[in-house]
Amino acid sequence: TVRYASPTNFEMEVVERSLNKITYKIPTGSDFEVKNNNLTFFEKSPFSGENYYTYTANGECYCNVIHRGDEVFRTLRSPTKNAFKIKKTGDHTVECRYFVSPKFKVGDVVAMSRNKLRDNCGLFFENCSDIFCERLTVNYMHGFGWLSQMCENLSFDKLTFKPASGYRVSSFADLIHVCGCKGYVKITDSHFEHPHDDAINVHGAFLRFRKACDERTAELEFVHHQQGGYKAFYSGDKVKIYSRTDLSELDGVYTVDSTDDNIDKKTVIVKFKEKLPPMKPEMYVFENITYNPNLTVSGCTFNAIPTRGILCTTDKESEIFGNTFKSVGMPDILSLIHI
């Protein structure tokens, strides 16, 4: 079982509510303080006594999820937003006063996260092959969740993702997150519940075209602030090119000859065996289709998912069957780009 002593989603349960005041209960494993009318969560190292992190809940925290039993949904509302007075009333309780209380209900658990900051992973596979994961229980993961990147042949069987006792959130973001993998990805007979984002997310990577170095060579870049820091192309890989405006494919598949990576700058110069078509800078993206997997998801249950049950973006064959979806806030299955 994978557990966290102090999960990095910050949960506040509504235990009392009136027109101008709400009392919230915070799980026993989450340390916090109220100072200068600010609510700050933190976790201390048992070795150095220094904080691993601090997070001050504020009105800018928009990435919140309300857990109302198994009904879950994203919200812009926050326990601390518009609170003119915040007071610690017990070891695990906080009172917030408002001109008008936000429309939470008694029993609601409001789960907050550090906005867009996903600086790590709960579990991480990179450049691995023939991995088989079986009969694991995951109570919580930080960052991207369980991330597999540039791997080949992954199997996940009889896994259970559920929050630990006393908590409502099982992952800071996605549960199983597959980015740029090849061969197959098989996810079978597993249970997914209460993440802060998607249950399963399978996708490749688009690198933006910066400039042509010559007729066979292009400089590409990672643009998304949450992506980069790894080698995305290898000699012999097959690549497709898409227009950024409508994601239509350009004719042809291009074969990687060699690469020159600048990991820190999130750029790569790729030499291809074929001549490249004429392209305007920043108007096209390149995808390594060799690192798109065949996907199988079967016999799984999905419950209390605030976003998508399965988000699938691969141009290989996908088989999704025999699954059960309940209380999914967005599409149960969303397939993008490659249909």
Identify what each model region corresponds to.
Residues T1-S18, K105-R118, E134-V138:
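Right-handed parallel beta-helix/beta-spiral solenoid domain characteristic of secreted/periplasmic
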Residues V2-N20, P27-K87, G228-I263:
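Ser/Thr/Gly-rich low-complexity blocks that favor extended beta-strand/coil architectures
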Residues A5, D119, C128, N139-G143, ...:
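Surface-exposed loop/turn segments connecting beta-strands in extracellular beta-rich domains
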Residues R68-D119, L250-G252, S258-L295, N303-A304:
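Small/polar beta-strand repeat architecture
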Residues N120-G122, H142-L147, A164-D174, H196-V202, ...:
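Short glycine/acidic-rich loop motifs that flank beta-strands on beta-rich extracellular proteins
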Residues C128-F132, Q149-S155, C181-K186, P293-T296, ...:
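Short "repeat-start/strand-capping" segments in structured domains, especially the N-termini
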Residues I337-I339:
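Conserved small/polar residues in nucleotide/adenosyl-binding loops
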